[in-house]
């Protein structure tokens, strides 16, 4: 009887720990996805096109007579 009770407690503890492991991996995956997204956004902003704002506002490039066209 005592041995069966100990086995039952250990099985419950095992289930709880397995659930915590699953939750940990879910949080880890979400964190990695967010980190990847932020890293990608940072790389895009690292070397922005200096004339992109001109395209967005339809402003002519100084020194040129025509509007800039998207590359």
UniProtKB/Swiss-Prot annotation:
Tissue specificity remark: Detected in colon (at protein level).
Mutagenesis / variant outcome for changing residue 63 to A: No effect on binding to IGF2BP1
GO process terms (BP): mRNA stabilization; positive regulation of mRNA binding
Origin: domain of life: Eukaryota
Function in brief: Enhances binding of IGF2BP1 to N6-methyladenosine (m6A)-containing mRNAs, thereby contributing to increased mRNA stability. Also increases the interaction of IGF2BP1 with RNA stabilizers ELAVL1/HUR, MATR3 and PABPC1, and increases the interaction of RNA stabilizers ELAVL1/HUR, MATR3 and PABPC1 with m6A-containing mRNAs. Contributes to MYC stability by enhancing binding of IGF2BP1 to m6A-containing MYC mRNAs and increasing recruitment of RNA stabilizing proteins to m6A-containing MYC mRNAs.
Miscellaneous comment text of the record: Promotes colon cancer cell growth, colony formation, migration and invasion through enhanced stability of MYC. Expressed in colorectal, breast, ovarian and nasopharyngeal cancer cells. Higher levels are found in colon cancer cells than in adjacent nontumor tissue.
SUBUNIT field: Interacts with IGF2BP1 (via KH3 and KH4 domains); the interaction results in increased binding of IGF2BP1 to N6-methyladenosine (m6A)-containing mRNAs.
Official protein name in the record: Putative RNA-binding regulatory peptide
């Amino acid at each position: 009887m005592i041995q069966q009770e100990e086995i039952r407690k250990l099985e419950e503890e095992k289930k709880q720990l397995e659930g915590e492991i699953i939750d940990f991996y879910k949080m880890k995956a979400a964190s990695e996805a967010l980190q990847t997204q932020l890293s990608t956004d940072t790389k895009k902003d690292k070397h922005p096109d200096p004339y992109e704002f001109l395209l967005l506002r339809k402003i002519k490039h100084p020194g040129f007579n025509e509007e800039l066209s998207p590359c």
